[in-house]
Regions:
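Conserved Rossmann-fold cofactor-binding substructure of NAD(P)-dependent oxidoreductases
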Residues: 60-89
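N-terminal Rossmann NAD(P)H-binding glycine-rich loop of SDR-like oxidoreductase domains
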Residues: 4-26
Length: 167
């Protein structure tokens, strides 16, 4: 049994603060078990004092240090990452989540990186029933809208939808 329901990785980032504030306003510190994580203890304490309360645990880690990431990945059901660029900081995190049966979500708009994740982690995640959910935010809207418009034009001109779209 994992100790936390969700941990926000990158809680001191602009979006991380918004996610932290939302979770606290929606659930407080007792309806679900959650924590915040990032690189800088001072910044995380500031976020916690501004938008949450002192009962929300803090984890410190470095995106390139597996051991520090595992200290919180192993303890939660879900990692919500707001740390980008994801192609630089996210691959190791996703790999460790899949290896440790932890679900993962992010707000990436990096379609090329999502393809890399699918190629590298989809089968193992699927076999373990681990969810990897990318683009859970505003950043995904431009690419989603582009695909939508391309598909509409394909249907109008060629009477069929594109089977795939490379970006």
């Amino acid at each position: 049994m994992k100790q936390f329901d969700i941990i926000i990785w990158g809680a001191s980032s602009f979006t991380g603060k918004l996610v932290t504030e939302y979770l606290f306003n929606k659930f407080g510190s007792s309806k679900i078990k959650w924590a915040i994580a990032g690189r800088d203890l001072g910044k995380l304490k500031k976020v916690r004092s501004q938008v949450a309360d002192k009962n929300i645990p803090i984890f410190i880690a470095d995106s390139f240090d597996e051991e520090s990431l595992l200290k919180f990945i192993k303890k939660t059901k879900v990692i919500c990452s707001t740390v980008g660029p994801y192609s630089l900081y996210g691959t190791k995190l996703v790999k460790l989540c899949v290896e440790n049966n932890t679900n993962y979500c992010d707000i990436t708009g990096e379609a090329h990186w999502i393809r890399t994740l699918i190629d590298n982690f989809h089968e193992e995640a699927k076999s373990k029933k681990i969810k990897i959910v990318n683009s859970c935010g505003f950043d995904s809207i431009p690419s989603d809208m582009g695909v939508y418009f391309i598909q509409n034009e394909m249907k109008k001109i060629y009477k069929t939808y594109a089977k795939s779209i490379k970006m």
